[in-house]
């Protein structure tokens, strides 16, 4: 009885098995096997896609550039023989960009951007905007994008000095790809200033678009004397090297650059971020407007474009800030604030100052209204300007920041105001003549 009971107990506790192996062990082995098979299939598919992509690149062009966006439909490189003393016999990759946006499309924010190629040198220079740089080229020129080569940093990217093997120097902006911002700014700058050449605008030399690394970089001419913000607000000692005449030269140069964008192009370009840090200076204090990442195109038949409010606090015009309606008048307002900054040496908004002086525009208007205009001059200017020159500059500031945007002058008129010796005093001069009669 006891033996049969014991045998019965043994048989009931025996674990299930397959081919003498524990069932759970068999399941584990099968799971690992299935996982390995799935991994092999996945690797095979990936390798197949990479191989197919390589074959397509070789088939179309061994020097093709990765596509930038859906709007940039085609990019080709063309070998161009460079016949110069410095680079005889070299082949350069030139990228030719043709902007094909109607005015309506342009006002909506750079809807179309097509790229074509040309083997003709003259046509390439007339239609194109710069050279294609490989990521490796720029890594070498910037010493691996080292901190020692970093010359600027902002919300949309980091700027590095690039020293190329041929002795040329450039500034490389590595765009930060926050929520696709690099792609947007890349396209905006190409459309805005890709074909523009003006002595008061920073020249765009070329670009780098590396899809594998998700890199978008813009290559500009190198301006070797920093920006206006550094010279106005940096530690330059008790006496600023920016004399009154130099400051007016910078202001006029900036105005000429903006006037070209507004009045010399079709469609016109609204910069949308005019400020002291975006005014670069060379050793002769020539001003060059830079950073077109927020720029908008405005067709001739359109008086404004409605867009999300962007810019820098203190420089943004009140009508744009409140309605989102943008046109060149917004740049004029920003220039007026910039001119105040040049004259006073003060930032547009400075929370370290007393409450009545925090906002530059309000303080400036109050000082001029109370006939204390001579007191607004930057104390770091050693030699004060002639009274007529000061009055002329003050008048330009006030006209640029008129709350009625339609009453603000055009940039071309501003240039005339700043350069014409007798502009602010013509009405007074006429009235004196009338009284003498």
UniProtKB/Swiss-Prot annotation:
Q: Which residues form the Protein kinase domain?
A: 145-426
Spell out which residues are annotated as carrying Phosphoserine: 277
What protein family is recorded? Belongs to the protein kinase superfamily. Ser/Thr protein kinase family.
Quote the catalytic residue positions. 273 (proton acceptor)
Q: Where does ATP bind?
A: 151-159, 173
Matches recorded under Gene3D superfamilies: Phosphorylase Kinase, domain 1 (3.30.200.20), Transferase(Phosphotransferase) domain 1 (1.10.510.10)
Q: Which residues carry this modification: Phosphotyrosine?
A: 220, 320
Which residues are listed as membrane-spanning? 25-45
Task: Give the keywords, sorted.
Answer: ATP-binding, Cell membrane, Kinase, Membrane, Nucleotide-binding, Phosphoprotein, Serine/threonine-protein kinase, Transferase, Transmembrane, Transmembrane helix
SUPFAM superfamilies hit by this protein = Protein kinase-like (PK-like)
Q: Phosphothreonine (modified residue): where?
A: 307, 312
Q: Which PANTHER family match?
A: OS01G0323000 PROTEIN (PTHR47984), OS03G0227900 PROTEIN (PTHR47984:SF31)
* UniProt catalytic activity: L-seryl-[protein] + ATP = O-phospho-L-seryl-[protein] + ADP + H(+); L-threonyl-[protein] + ATP = O-phospho-L-threonyl-[protein] + ADP + H(+)
Q: List cystine links.
A: none
Q: Which InterPro entries match?
A: Kinase-like_dom_sf, Prot_kinase_dom, Protein_kinase_ATP_BS, RLK_Ser/Thr-Kinase, Ser-Thr/Tyr_kinase_cat_dom, Ser/Thr_kinase_AS
Q: Where in the cell is it found?
A: Cell membrane
One GO cellular component term noted in the UniProt record for this chain: plasma membrane
Tell me the protein's name. Answer: Probable receptor-like serine/threonine-protein kinase At4g34500
Per UniProt, what is the membrane topology? Single-pass membrane protein
Q: A Gene Ontology molecular-function term?
A: protein serine/threonine kinase activity
Q: EC no.?
A: 2.7.11.1
